């Protein structure tokens, strides 16, 4: 950002644009690569971070556990890693806008991320329970679905947060 800001101050918008584009390309490649690795290697990641979940399939079959936490964790990792990549790109947009002394949109944009998560939780909870604000009415399966809905909402919110900052 300091180099980009200096190019803007020196009234070199073409060079600044090329520099910002190059940085965006690098961030897109790096964040996209990490997101892809997270999706592909979600099972080993969960195995390392939550080894206690490994025997969940057997425990669910035996009736001692209501759902398979390992499978759920793998599914959430596969949604959250791409979301994190989108948030990296959103931070790039924030830096570019700040360099142009545009502060409102970059600092309001994260509210869209939060609003998307909240909206999907309320909407998903209503659809699954039939009553807003009644989490006790949700079964274990419905709570699992609600967690996945929240993850999708977070990913969608990240896209909104990034999208509103684009020129």
Each predicted region: which residue ranges?
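Membrane-embedded alpha-helical bundles of multi-pass transporters/translocases
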Residues: 1-167
